[in-house]
């Protein structure tokens, strides 16, 4: 028998060739009525097609395993034999009439029953459109976030859909225009910010991304509402592209950063002065993060913090001079490729050094360094959190390089002396080290989140209050909350009402509800958001300065919306944003049905999210796509609104998509979280495979069409999982894809790899065991698509190059899709569309492979006959 398909290694698809739209596909395991040769022919699934007898030596068989019909012709002589010598029987016309009448009655009853019992949505579904890639980028599906921000006890600033910026007073229920949308449009501004005194607006335009959060751009100032724009520049340069600019907490004071130096302006119109001048481009960063701090530690590009009264500025000084340099090549646009060098610490290499400084802004500039803890475990450290407690006290969290010891200190901004307030230690790693404490006005009491033992499931994250007593060096510490659930964020402290407001998973791990708790007495809790907004269980919130009002942002599962509430009775005052245009678009589409399920495994649960087609039936066979993320501490199963390429796979191509949170995931206790320590991939594979096995037990899943996809760390997992064997040691997955996969953790960022695998160089066994090179030798049969931008600054193309070397040695069947000179985050909308089409088309073709194999087999059998 001839080969069913030609295996290949090293097939490289350029951006022109891969996403060519596939032919009309039928992923549901059967042919549509327009293809099967007759209006009444019943569609066959892949199994039925494989089992159906094939016609031998005759014509009429269609491609793709169509059902074939054999006709036996009768000769004229046969007709004569039937006609000659036959006597017509006597017919009972009365009986025939009665029988016909009964048949008509029965048929009418059947038709009536079908009409009555058919759900109304089935009729409406046929009128709805399927979700397409174009929809993902259309205005109809674009969620508008008003970016509402409280600026007083009763006022907040927000932006309308058309771009106009308004000030809303909840007490008088009136609004004032601050910036017309047309003005923002005329300036081509990407971002805006209003000064604290509401006199000026700061705009940025011609913004150029650097990494995930950082960018450079031009800035202008404009008097509200109709002033002419004034360029914001350092005294020595005109028309300068700045790395950052932003207002302070008072009046019109602002700072901006140029060439890693900090400039301060007391008010608009006054010349800026350089207050920090030790910066060196690409090497010494003042007030800004380098790559490692932006991506893995602070998770923002901003590394400076104003005191509440605006008299001081704390800033981080990050020195990359000893950090090895990575070079990102640029292949297009010039005859010879060029490179962009930047400092990137990999596992075991030199890390950036960091120090925290405070400068006074009133009078002569005085720079004072805050002293790190005098602890031998802190020989190398990260600064993970900075928060002002008062105008002279600043809280700092110091984390050792191994990331298993952290110390929270309160530093005196006038002396630089730091006092230890809390210490945490773990045998594994310390999670959630960016959490900001919330302080009382005098700074003597503060609330922070720490992990507290809660029984067999390990520790959960809860609110603790620390109170310092006058004339005493000891602090009184009490836990405000407890239970086998997590506080995810502290929002506000109402000192007058003795209440703390926070978000938690107490309802369910996949939800985020808004709660309050008393800070005195028995710490009673109350859910403020439960059953408050229809079809909303995942919230974030912000409170007015007086705590009398709050903005409630619904993030799912329904279409996101923002409402304004009174804190006293939770009563909704008005809707700020409902995204009606998105609701209409959703109602006009065949959106996936979302189901949640828990699998019980030994002593833990495995939460699953299942996306099914809107037209789902138990009798149809659907392909299964497993989507993995699984970065330790993350969560894939959450009740958040999302329309993604996975939605397109379900809606337009009839796939079932499943996600799950196994060992290593967050919000289920530290025991489950820390189980993956020093063995990344091993336990995640077992849990993800358990989810797949559970789905394969369902009669509606086609066992011959199962795929896996992941990006970043999920790309590592999808590559790790793809060769996994199922029952009887057979292949589970037909195909798989990885986007920017991590393939060797010693090539990845130091802070990430060392957090989970330990310090490289001391014991490298964990690094060797987690290499995917050990797994790819089994990838001879499955289709494997690797996608990687060549200028990926987070997960270098080096990872994919190493992987491909192993794939070639293993004679694996793979395809490679590259994006020349594109960064990790795909800032271009057109490239994102191309990316999504590439992924979707790959899986569509993969899920059609069984039909192709059946067709080839049928043709070969016919040739043999």
From Swiss-Prot:
Q: From the UniProt record, give one GO term of the biological process aspect.
A: proteolysis
Q: Does the keyword Transmembrane apply?
A: yes
Pfam families found in the cross-reference section: DPPIV_N, Peptidase_S9
What tissue specificity does the UniProt entry give?
Expressed predominantly in brain.
Q: For this protein, what is any one GO molecular function term? A: potassium channel regulator activity
Q: Which SUPFAM superfamilies is this protein grouped with?
A: alpha/beta-Hydrolases (SSF53474), DPP6 N-terminal domain-like (SSF82171)
* Membrane topology, Extracellular segments: 117-865
The alphabetized UniProt keywords are:
Cell membrane, Disease variant, Disulfide bond, Glycoprotein, Intellectual disability, Membrane, Neurodegeneration, Signal-anchor, Transmembrane, Transmembrane helix
The residues that carry sugar chains are 173, 319, 404, 471, 535, 566, 813
What PTMs does it carry? N-glycosylated.
Query: Region entry Disordered: which residue ranges?
Result: 1-88
- Which InterPro entries does this chain map to? AB_hydrolase_fold, Peptidase_S9_cat, Peptidase_S9B_N, Serine_Prot_S9B/DPPIV
Q: Which domain of life is it from?
A: Eukaryota
Provide the membrane topology annotation.
Single-pass type II membrane protein
List all membrane-crossing ranges: 96-116
Q: Which residues lie on this side of the membrane: Cytoplasmic?
A: 1-95
Q: Could you tell me which cysteines form disulfide bridges?
A: 411-418, 527-530, 536-554, 735-846
Entry GO terms, CC: membrane; plasma membrane; voltage-gated potassium channel complex
Q: How does it assemble?
A: Homodimer (in vitro). Interacts with KCND2. Identified in a complex with KCND2 and KCNIP2. Forms an octameric complex composed of four DPP6 subunits bound to the KCND2 tetramer. Interacts with KCND3; this interaction modulates the channel gating kinetics namely channel activation and inactivation kinetics and rate of recovery from inactivation.
Give the similarity note: Belongs to the peptidase S9B family.
Q: What does this protein do?
A: Promotes cell surface expression of the potassium channel KCND2. Modulates the activity and gating characteristics of the potassium channel KCND2. Has no dipeptidyl aminopeptidase activity.
Known disease link: Familial paroxysmal ventricular fibrillation 2: A cardiac arrhythmia marked by fibrillary contractions of the ventricular muscle due to rapid repetitive excitation of myocardial fibers without coordinated contraction of the ventricle and by absence of atrial activity. Intellectual developmental disorder, autosomal dominant 33: A disorder characterized by significantly below average general intellectual functioning associated with impairments in adaptive behavior and manifested during the developmental period. MRD33 patients manifest microcephaly in addition to intellectual disability.
Extra facts: Genetic variation in DPP6 may influence susceptibility to amyotrophic lateral sclerosis (ALS). ALS is a severely disabling and lethal disorder caused by progressive degeneration of motor neurons in the brain, spinal cord and brainstem.
Q: What is this protein called?
A: A-type potassium channel modulatory protein DPP6
| Species for this entry | Homo sapiens
